Amino acid sequence: MPNLTYKFITYKELIDGTYKDAYIPQDDKFPVTSHLTPSLRNAMIACPGNNDESKTFMKVCVDEENKEIGRAFCFGTRIKAGGRVYGAGTGFGFEVIEEYRKEGVGADLLLMTRNEFDFVLVAGISLKAFPLYRKLRYHLFEVQQFYKVRHARYVVKPRDLKGWLSLEKKTVKLKLKDIPNLIKYYELKRKVLIKKETIVPEWVTDMVANDGHQFMEVHDREWFQWNLDYNTYGFDEDIQSFYSVLDRNNKPLGFFMTKERLVQKSGPDKGLIRGTVVEWGACDKKALSESDINLLAMYSFSKRIDVIFTLACESDTASQLLRMGFKERASFKAGIKDKKKQLENIGDQQRWRLRYGMTNMIIL
């Protein structure tokens, strides 16, 4: 058994820069970058859930040479249960070098706590990590994800003349298949106004809080503004956008938020641009359905987008998305842990307002 040391790094250490003395990053050992970019540092300091500098920013496991072999970043959020709001911990960047995973480093990092929160909320759980969260007795949720190809290069990678001809043929097919969506889109646009916002409107707070679910992560105006203004890497291509949906008298009907990300990681998708519908809501789902919002969001993305991802959270959305040309993909996974078992029915997925844009998933 290797001699391992676990350390807590606080937000105060992040702010004053002394966190750099705690470990030696092993960037080349991880499938993604070290994460702690200047952009992410600024985002975490500005996070509306981080109001106590003494709380944990990062849990890290190091070897005898003080080199990082595992880590988990932490930050604060809030959950709403009925009429009450509770502080909750959450995190991201949970990674362990492969050869140490059998040593239980991953479980140790998740279990290691200073009892700063009674609840822990997680989202975007990977397929590999999902069994670990189940073993740690999290209440786990799965929501069906969907994707829609917008540019043929997402599925066709031309290397010769035949490949380029195939790309052009696929491009024409995609445009023809999209004609029914365009017709529905313009019909819907005659009824509503879509306004791109740089300052998130105040009415969003109540619209989200009163959507009818017993449990949810608190997504108020301040939280949305933070997600609009910051992201993890700070690349020029990384964009978040917020849109209000109004009736013809400028009365709020709903909203949606999107993000665009250039794939930087090596692999077949490198250089492609992904669009994601990360948040949405409506005051009257009969007047503006979840599938309506996805239709509006589809045409809000820049023309450079290669593929769009979204979730089907309402019961009838999945069939509508399939008609719009979306295809199913692996489920989106999230979870909650109620350490003191305070809240009844907290593990009932039907009582939760679930969105792709939970925890840090928008700024990522």
Language model features with spans:
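Amide-forming acyltransferase catalytic core, primarily the GNAT-like/NAT-type
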Residues: 4-6, 11-64, 139-272, 277
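Catalytic micro-motifs at enzyme active sites that drive phosphoryl/nucleotidyl and oxygen chemistry
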Residues: 48, 58, 76-82, 106-110
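Conserved GNAT-family N-acetyltransferase fold
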Residues: 59, 70-72, 89, 94, ...
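Acetyl-CoA-dependent GNAT
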Residues: 74-82, 258-264
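Active-site beta-strand-loop-beta-strand hairpin of nuclease catalytic cores
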Residues: 87-88, 273
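Conserved acetyl-CoA-binding loop-helix of GNAT-fold acetyltransferases
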Residues: 93-116, 286-299
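Active-site/acyl-donor-binding loops of N-acyltransferases
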Residues: 119-175, 231, 241, 256-364
